[in-house]
Amino acid sequence: MQLDEDLEFAKKIFNPNRAFAKQARIKNMCEYKDLVHEANEDYEHFWGDLAKQKLTWFKPFDKVLNSDNAPFFKWFENGKINVSYNCIDRHLKDKKNKVAIIFEGEMGDYNVITYRKLHSEVNKTANLLKNEFNVKKGDRVIIYMPMIVESVYMMLACTRIGAIHSIVFAGFSPEALRDRINDAQAKLVITADGTFRKGKPYMLKPALDKALENNACPSVEKALIVIRNAKEIDYVRGRDFVYNEMVNYQSDKCEPEMMDSEDPLFLLYTSGSTGKPKGVQHSSAGYLLWAQMTMEWVFDIRDNDNFWCTADIGWITGHTYVVYGPLACGATTLILEGTMSYPDYGRWWRMIEEYRVDKFYTSPTAIRMLHAKGENEPSKYNLESLKVLGTVGEPINPTAWKWFYEKIGNSKCSIVDTWWQTETGGHIISPLPGATPIRASCATLPLPGIHAEVLNEDGTKTKPGEQGFLCITKPWPSMIRNIWGDEKRYIDSYFSQIKLNGEYVYLSGDGAIVDENGYITIIGRTDDIVNVSGHRIGTAEVESAISKHEMVAECAVVGIPDAIKGEGLFAFVVLCDGAKCNLGESLELLKEMNHILSIEIGKIAKLDNVMYVPGLPKTRSGKIMRRLLKSIAKKEPITQDLSTLEDVNVVKEIMSIAQMEE
């Protein structure tokens, strides 16, 4: 019954609020189509004009796009720029007393940072990194920090002196942190003693200590610690230094480093299907331009707006839409420490009311959880300040979309259901709030200048209603530049599978359907990546972790639909020596495997279901048929070709076990 209602609701068209559309930057579909036409007519001129108008340059670029070494594209060649200057200094003339950041801690503390204050703190932090830690242009700095204002200072300080930051999500394990430190060959690691979560101290420094123990990260010279929750922690003499004790001795004047357009801005590690995380490398100018443009187009950001993106800075959404995008626009961005549920499920709605939030951007997982746990909470608060709502990280189901639209947006706010990736830097497909007629759960249309198409494996376009591979067929400024230290993997991952007009195109790894109006609906991953609560987790790294359990001979992990998280993890496990386990033992084994996952990856990786099987379905070449296992996990009919299987009986045995467990 609910499915039928969802399907019917998903067909409805919602036009932009007329009053909002009148004052929007892009007011209707004609204006959208004009921009698309302009970009198509002269692609390089379109992007070059935007870069000249929107960014402040120390030296103008002399070439918009260099494709000579494709797919290693270069944008705005030979231009000189600094990202921190564009996010802070250029606003000081007219906006020095404007609020740049509003911070609210979980324990009720808050802080308001003006652009003048931000300038001072970033400069002092930059001088600290230079003078006391010898951080120079091109050095890598790992930031393992919670959602506090000092995290933003660290990011911008790195950009000011030309260091490359790599933020590691504060929920990741010491092992995951160690892997990223070593891959980046980081010189300095910055962390906090801890933070607050669900009303209690949550410690980070012990994880760093474990990551660095026994000289496991030889590139690291020192660690810088921000005191946040003031709990007692251990210090390593000569290695660990306290930020709070040192920063105020530094000058608040620091000239920004002149950076080339293509100089790396940051590395951000994302899950790869091979198990080893990929260090996605983004450039300075191209990334920042698109961060600013998508803020202006997709959120229609205005001078007096309070913008709140709930993402953690450890993810690309936090980079682009908590920090760089809002600050490049001279807007006010909100930062929240802790969870949505503490002290209760009304916390986010109280924040919107108290800080008069205009544009609100969050994940479908959060929406589903708030709907399930606190459906009536929004009615207790005044949410009339909201003008645009946004979703990110995964497809949103119609039921959650409907609740978000009606109960949070009061049926008057456009929902911008954005599709993009760590690798794209910013939005690729999204409605425009003043122009695009929207449908529930539909990403709608590519943004101007973006050539996103749904293709078959042979490079032909799919017919309306047919599922295909979502590709981007022309380079764009904010695209990934490389995988750190692994050019071959960069090409193999993104530019080696589908050709259009004889040239390889960017393969997103997502499946999609385009309708007769050109609207694109995202289906989900087509590779071995599972999207859990908006976090991309590689099944290979999950399998590698749980295989470390002494009772596990081999395993295969697939993603299955989850009402709250979007996708959950389902493991098919073969026990050593054909061992079997009863219900109690199987539950204990599940608990132990999840403990291993929390250590190896972090608490975001957790098995929801396990099926103990005698073997795994493999082709004669030894490849596990995960699509077949996914069908079994989802209780769908088996439609895959079984002729290449080494042993068809394995499938029959697994299906028999599945039927018994129903």
UniProtKB/Swiss-Prot annotation:
Its cofactor is Mg(2+). It catalyses: acetate + ATP + CoA = acetyl-CoA + AMP + diphosphate. Acetylated. Deacetylation by the SIR2-homolog deacetylase activates the enzyme. GO terms for molecular function: acetate-CoA ligase activity; AMP binding; ATP binding; metal ion binding. HAMAP family: Ac_CoA_synth. Catalyzes the conversion of acetate into acetyl-CoA (AcCoA), an essential intermediate at the junction of anabolic and catabolic pathways. AcsA undergoes a two-step reaction. In the first half reaction, AcsA combines acetate with ATP to form acetyl-adenylate (AcAMP) intermediate. In the second half reaction, it can then transfer the acetyl group from AcAMP to the sulfhydryl group of CoA, forming the product AcCoA. Belongs to the ATP-dependent AMP-binding enzyme family. This is Acetyl-coenzyme A synthetase.
